[in-house]
Amino acid sequence: MTLRAVLFDVDFTLCRPGPELSADRYARIAARHGITLDTSRYDDARDAAVLNLKRHPELLHDESIWHRFTEEIFIGMGGQEAIASECATEIEEGWGVSENFELFEDVLPVLEELRRAELRIAVVSNGIRDLQAFVAHHRLDVDAIVDSRSHGRVKPHPTIFQAALVLLAVAPEDAVMVGDSIEEDIEGARALGMRAILIDREERHPDVHERLTDLYGLPAALGLARPT
């Protein structure tokens, strides 16, 4: 392997949702409809919705599936099925706004360090927002942008990784995938012959091989010389 490129997941790898995309946003929208949600149930509701999302083995990007995903979180927090779709539409509008996401503090300095090492960089993401606009807003210096919305398949489908590799003009064995999802990012990339490193910011997976708790350790994990 000759390292030539690094592919990054986006959500919870490079950025986190800001206040406008938190459980409180669900609660505020529900309150306008006279519904009280239990924000303490957000994490469990989201985990359950993720499990249902994985029941679509064809791995097609389908906006109706993402809409249902948001509805299920709303219902899981105590919302009513009758108004779930309307509330989900309002919630999803916030996910399309680049300003509603905050970069982790380690992102820009680490991307700069990868550039100094003359590595090519891509972002590969599942989701419904305009990733080109997100990259431009946050001034991410990348060579390739691939999202499920434009590609048509979601990670861990091999073609979404392959699309990024083609744009970067590198072979799988010469690239590394960095992401926070074991199934979507790590297993998906390794199945294609790529090296993959889990970014585990909340330290949920201590037993995973090749794991970092922040991006500051990535250059060393890649064997890059530290700048002098």
Give residue ranges: language-model regions.
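Asp-based, Mg2+/Mn2+-dependent phosphohydrolase catalytic module
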Residues: 1-6, 16-17, 37-40, 82-86, ...
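N-terminal helical cap/lid subdomain that shapes the substrate entry/recognition surface
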Residues: 2-108, 116
